[in-house]
Amino acid sequence: MSGREQTGEKLSDSEYIEEEPRRSRIGNLKKKAFSCSTKLTHPLKMRKGKRKIDFQIPLIEDVRDEKEEKLVSKLRQQLLQKDLLPPVHDDYHMLLRFLKTMEFKIEKTVTAWEEMLKWRKEFGTDRIIQDFNFKELDEVTRHYPQGYHGVDKDGRPIYIERLGKAHPGKLMEVTTIERYLKYHVQEFERTLQEKLPACSVAAKRRVTTTTTILDVEGLGMKNFTPTAANLLATIAKVDCNYYPETLHRMFIVNAGIGFRSFLWPAAQKLLDPMTIAKIQVLEPRSLSKLLEAIDSSQLPEFLGGLCKCPNEGGCLRSNKGPWNDPEIVELVHHMEVNNVPQTTTAPLHVRDYDSTTCTISPKETLKEEPEPEEYYSSTGSRSSMHTCIVPPLSDKASTSDGDKFITTVESIESAQSQLLDADTENTFANTSVREGGQILRFGALREKINSENIFHLVKILLVFPLKLFVLFGFLLPGYWQRQNTVVVPDSSTNNKVLECFDRLKKMEKEFTEISRKQVKIPEANEKLLAESLERIKSLELDLDKTKSVLHITLTKQLQITEQLESQDEERRKGCCF
């Protein structure tokens, strides 16, 4: 027992009655502060005991054009009126891709959107990731090497195909066009639902497009068959109609003289100028240009990089990328579970914050004049102790794929200060708690927060003219870029591609018929040939007769010679006697 208990020192009844509510209030406030402080753990601070993982959604920056936002908003309203906008497809960037394909004509876009929804329902696209199992994937990739591997310097996923090593005939022996098309759509859905969000989290900015590398080394007539033509036509139709504007750039590497002289000029006639501008053809000795856009650690060795994936199948089967990082996958899943809203009508230079998802640092202590606690993330950027789920909104004009971003630190800090104000009012009920249990009034804290808001307001007013100048600097080039990059309607491009495939089919049929026909010589030539053969035979007979006569003559000559020699010898013997 303590000394106070031994001496019998106790509080009086009145002191005990006054002390009991005070203790209960302190206990409640301690519980609130403890429960609130354990929501977020600092990523770089070591804690004793078992580590509690709490997923913190990073700030993903996104810049949008004001005119494009208005058009997307109009399109969204029309789709909602016609009940053509399911929540799963209510995405700003998806709507913008269809608008760009249809030259920002809303009526055509609504028609294309309706066709897309109808196709997804008939094809079962919404459930294809869960329902479809492509068992023959290993054999297919053996006859048609392809796959995702790494990201470029802007954080976009890289898709690689080795067309020169594709064997369409062997490919159709292990699968069918229908099953391969389902696999193609399944991979597209995985890219949109898993790979692009993971790349956005890793790059901390919105990623909506991909980078493609086509290796045409060894490409020849063996790769152009009717089966390959049908497969390419089907895939091109799906990509153009239902997944438009997903390509950022394409590199065609190891292009020989034949490809650059014949195939590429013919292909350019079927492509619009904007698509041609996205494609870069590289010679075998120009592979080093890939390193300007892609880090060497993200490139396979056969493309001039340093990556040697040890798994079976090499780099193309490794599926290397941020989408395989468990922490990033959990973050993406956490964003989907929290159902982060997509804002389409918010003005520029404004970001909406979801205050219900804010979390507080575990070691946050409030004093009479508290200073806002800050820490540095693993990438070196400074963050506030309050981290919120931030839906991407626009700040300045963007490029065609929305991947160039401009940070608005002042507006973010101002919003975070307002969140701190609201969170403190709701949580601490005009009181603040220190570790020692001392109770302080909320007035000092509120006064400090108001002074910080005034400081941020003055900061914004001072920086606003500079931002306005920068805005005009980005707006004018972006306007001319959008004016010069007009997308050719999808239907005409698709028709041209189909016409080209039809011509290719006709040529292949004619070639097959010609190869099957037996070679026939004209009758006149056959007669001449027969007469020549008869003459040759008669000459051969005459030659044989001549040879026999000559042989007989030679034998007679030898006999005569022998007779003459014998007569000479007899004469010589007679003379001697």
From Swiss-Prot:
What PROSITE patterns does UniProt report for this protein, alphabetically?
A: CRAL_TRIO
A biological-process GO annotation:
protein transport
This protein's major location comes to: Golgi
The UniProt annotation puts the region (Disordered) at 1-22, 364-383
User: Which parts of the chain are coiled coil?
Assistant: 523-550
Q: How does it sit in the membrane?
A: Peripheral membrane protein
**Cell location:** Golgi apparatus membrane; Cell membrane
Gene3D superfamilies registered for this protein in UniProt: CRAL-TRIO lipid binding domain, N-terminal domain of phosphatidylinositol transfer protein sec14p
SUPFAM superfamilies, per the entry:
CRAL/TRIO domain, CRAL/TRIO N-terminal domain
Instruction: Determine the domain of life of the protein's source.
Output: Eukaryota
Query: What do the Gene Ontology cellular component annotations say?
Result: Golgi membrane; plasma membrane
Q: Report keywords, A-Z.
A: Cell membrane, Coiled coil, Golgi apparatus, Membrane, Protein transport, Transport
Which CDD domains does the record cross-reference, listed alphabetically?
SEC14
Q: Pfam families annotated for this entry? A: CRAL_TRIO (PF00650)
Give yes or no: UniProt keyword Cytoplasm.
no
Q: Residue ranges of the CRAL-TRIO domain?
A: 136-311
Instruction: Give a short account of what the protein does.
Output: Required for transport of secretory proteins from the Golgi complex. Catalyzes the transfer of phosphatidylinositol and phosphatidylcholine between membranes in vitro.
Q: Give the protein family.
A: Belongs to the SFH family.
Protein's UniProt name:
Phosphatidylinositol/phosphatidylcholine transfer protein SFH14
State the organism named in the record.
Arabidopsis thaliana
